[in-house]
């Protein structure tokens, strides 16, 4: 069993949602740790990589056991499914960056509010459609996939390459990224 370190490099603003709002100011806030720093939840990474493995399996032969070991298998009425054998940590800023940002009180500079509104067919904004979301500026975060079976390392590396966008609005220009294996 091996731990695989990875890095997510964001090339555009990104938003992993917390499910919270800031009253009348912002409709959707970014998920943050107790120090107010952004991170990508491990379950988000796991879901994206599972989706990537599923897409990849349409082009190359991937053993179902490998997908089940890495991501688990959901159950149904006839089968209880199975849990994955690996664990995905949250992807966070590197320790040096965290310490610098916190000690210099720079957390507020990591975020931007972006406003949008719905436009009618006649080109005029719809009433009451203004929405503001908080986004994180482009940066890099790091995570670990723990307890990876040696025979699944190559599949995991291939799924990293498949992910090109992450988070809210990933089909509208937010969250453009690259995931790469470290070390």
Q: Model-found features: residue ranges?
A:
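RNA-binding basic/glycine-rich loop and surface signature characteristic of RAMP-family CRISPR effectors
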Residues: 1-111, 128-183
């Amino acid at each position: 069993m091996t731990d695989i370190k990875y890095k997510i490099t964001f090339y555009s603003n990104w938003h992993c949602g917390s499910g919270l709002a800031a009253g009348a100011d912002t409709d959707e806030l970014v998920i943050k740790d107790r120090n107010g720093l952004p991170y990508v939840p491990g379950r988000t990474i796991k879901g994206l990589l599972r989706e990537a493995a599923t897409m990849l399996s349409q082009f190359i032969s991937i053993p179902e056991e490998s997908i089940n070991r890495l991501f688990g298998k959901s159950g149904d009425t006839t089968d209880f499914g199975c849990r994955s054998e690996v664990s995905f940590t949250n992807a966070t800023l590197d320790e040096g960056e965290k310490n610098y940002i916190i000690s210099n009180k720079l957390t507020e500079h990591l975020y931007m509010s972006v406003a949008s509104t719905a436009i009618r067919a006649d080109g005029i904004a719809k009433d009451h459609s203004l929405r503001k979301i908080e986004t994180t500026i482009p940066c890099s975060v790091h995570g670990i996939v723990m307890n990876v079976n040696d025979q699944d390392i190559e599949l995991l590396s291939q799924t990293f390459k498949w992910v090109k966008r992450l988070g809210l609005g990933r089909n509208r220009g937010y969250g453009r990224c690259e995931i790469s294996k470290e070390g």
